[in-house]
Amino acid sequence: MLDAQQIKEIIPHRYPFLLVDRVTEVEEGKRAAGYKNVTVNEEFFNGHFPDYPVMPGVLIVEALAQVGAVALLMKEENRGRLAFFAGIDSCRFKKQVKPGDQLHLELEVLRFRGSIGKGKGVAKVDGEVVCEAELMFSLGEKQE
C-alpha cells in the first residue's frame, strides 16, 4: 500500500491536482488500484457547482490515469519518466461523484509497446461503476 507521500515520489502531481490518496494494489507495469476520498473542501467544488457539488468527470478520468501512472512508473526502467495522455476512448460516466464519496480507482494496462500504451480504467463508488474509459498514454522524459 502506498500513501500520498509515497505516491508523490513516483508521479509528479501535487495539490490541488494529486487526485489519488492511496494506492492499495500494484502489479508493476500491469495494473494498480487505489482510492480518492472526495471531500467538500476540494478546490473544484468552488465552481462545479457551488449549490450542487459534483466531481467533474474529466477529473475522475485524470484520477484513473494517475493510478495507472503509478503502475507504469514503479517499473525500474520507467522511474523518473512522465506519463502523458495520448487519447481517451469509450469513456462513459454512469453516476455522479459527490462530497463524502470514496472513489475507488483501478487501471489495467492492456498493451504497452515502446513508449505508447493503452489501459482500461474503472472508477466505482460503493461498488457501483461511476466511470469507465480506455486511456492511451505515452511515456516521455522530463524536458529542461
UniProtKB/Swiss-Prot annotation:
Active site at 48
- Which terms in the Gene Ontology molecular function aspect does this entry carry? (3R)-hydroxyacyl-[acyl-carrier-protein] dehydratase activity
Which domain of life, per UniProt?
Answer: Bacteria
GO biological processes: fatty acid biosynthetic process; lipid A biosynthetic process
Which terms are listed as keywords in the entry? Cytoplasm, Lipid A biosynthesis, Lipid biosynthesis, Lipid metabolism, Lyase
Its EC number(s): 4.2.1.59
- Indicate where this protein resides in the cell: Cytoplasm
Report which reactions are catalysed by this protein: a (3R)-hydroxyacyl-[ACP] = a (2E)-enoyl-[ACP] + H2O
Asked if the keyword Chaperone belongs to this entry, the reply reads: no
* Main localisation: cytoplasm
Q: Outline what the protein does.
A: Involved in unsaturated fatty acids biosynthesis. Catalyzes the dehydration of short chain beta-hydroxyacyl-ACPs and long chain saturated and unsaturated beta-hydroxyacyl-ACPs.
The identity of this protein, by name, is 3-hydroxyacyl-[acyl-carrier-protein] dehydratase FabZ
Annotated organism of origin: Bacillus licheniformis (strain ATCC 14580 / DSM 13 / JCM 2505 / CCUG 7422 / NBRC 12200 / NCIMB 9375 / NCTC 10341 / NRRL NRS-1264 / Gibson 46)
Gene behind this chain?
A: fabZ
